[in-house]
Amino acid sequence: ANLLAAMENEQADFVSSSRTLCRLDGSVMGPCPLTDPERFIDTNAMLFGRGAFPLLHQWVLMPDYGHLIGDRVMLHHLKESGVKRHHLDQESVFYRCAKEGLYGQMNEAIPEGVQPRPDYEASFVCWEADGLPPLR
């Protein structure tokens, strides 16, 4: 509701927020330290308004290597498009962490059952090899 209200109040085409990171058991670790409206917004914390709908095809058409970094790819296209963006400096999503990387960043013990950290770096290298600007 907060994102939708912000979209209306700010007359924005796209609104984003941060996320609250949770352990596999659902208990809260805290706010995501990675959220930066210029560099990284998790897909779960993105709200596309009608003015940003024409960009949604980028999700479908991104190269296979891009899916691992799809949230950054979409943020790139949003920024390039010039649509009016607004970021709420608050958490709107509870994100259950199933990959080990976020546990390390939160100084948490890595629990059993989480996936190893994916090779994001390989995707960034492929993106840049295609002549696109760095997303890191």
Predicted regions and their residues:
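Nucleotide-sugar donor-binding/catalytic module of glycosyltransferases
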Residues: A1-R136
